[in-house]
Design a protein with these regions (language model features):
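Conserved amphipathic alpha-helix within the SDR
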Residues: 85-91
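SAM cofactor-binding core of SAM-dependent methyltransferases
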Residues: 5-84
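Helix N-cap/coil-helix junction residues
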Residues: 24-25, 59, 91-93, 121
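Conserved acidic-Pro-Pro-aromatic motif
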Residues: 44-53, 66, 71, 92-217
Length: 217
């Protein structure tokens, strides 16, 4: 696959660059759970600029800040939302291009991931935090259960234990793809383990603006 080059990231770790390049499409769809602010440290703003659509949820009310975004923000505790109702009322297709999942309470990410996997929806790319650098509890309660579940559901871990450029040994996130929607040769080229995002992008020959990313961390 000829990867498309994206210059600027608004994500904490270049997740938006990764997603846009491997899917290589405009007008995709996303679901952002634990979305935080509308632009800085946001995984879907770059995608929106390229025609993507979707919904973003956060327990904190950022509705005033999100008025500048085209896509819908919902102030909601993701742990208590009716996912089937939420997804059915906002998506026409059962296949969503991108899921971004970032909850703050230990154990919540895996619990929410379980609920998502019980719905009739699936995703082409998933980025999910596990924060395993914080303690062994995060390894046992988040990272390992997340990996077991997603592998059982047919997802492939292409970038495990991703870290930020500034903190290359603080591994906090995994990047997954759905094996149904990518060919085996492409998937092989994306594999990495315990690498910082800038190293991953260099390996994939993706050009990007380092300052644009680092200024937002």
């Amino acid at each position: 696959m000829e990867l498309k080059k994206i210059m600027e990231s608004y994500s904490q770790c270049g997740q938006d660059i990764f997603v846009y390049n491997i899917l290589n499409k405009n007008n995709g769809t996303f679901l952002d759970l634990g979305c935080y602010l509308p632009k800085n440290i946001n995984n879907t703003y770059l995608l929106e600029l390229n025609g993507w659509s979707g919904i973003s949820l956060d327990i904190i009310d950022y509705s005033e800040e999100w008025k500048e975004r085209k896509n819908k923000f919902i102030q909601q505790d993701c742990m208590n939302v009716n996912l089937d109702e939420l997804l059915d009322s906002n998506y026409d297709n059962k296949v969503i291009d991108y899921l971004s999942l970032d909850m703050e309470v230990l154990g919540d990410r895996f619990k929410l991931l379980e609920k998502i996997m019980e719905t009739s929806y699936e995703f082409k790319v998933i980025t999910i935090e596990h924060d395993s650098y914080l303690s062994e509890d995060y390894v046992n309660v988040e990272k390992l259960p997340q990996r077991k579940l997603l592998k059982e559901k047919g997802y492939i871990l292409v970038c495990g234990d991703v870290s930020q450029k500034q903190y290359p040994t603080l591994f906090y996130e995994d990047w997954w793809v759905n094996s149904k929607y990518f060919n085996e040769e492409d998937i092989k080229t994306w594999f990495s383990d315990k690498l910082s995002c800038d190293t991953i992008f260099n390996k994939l020959n993706i050009n990007y603006n380092v300052n644009a990313i680092s200024e937002k961390w």
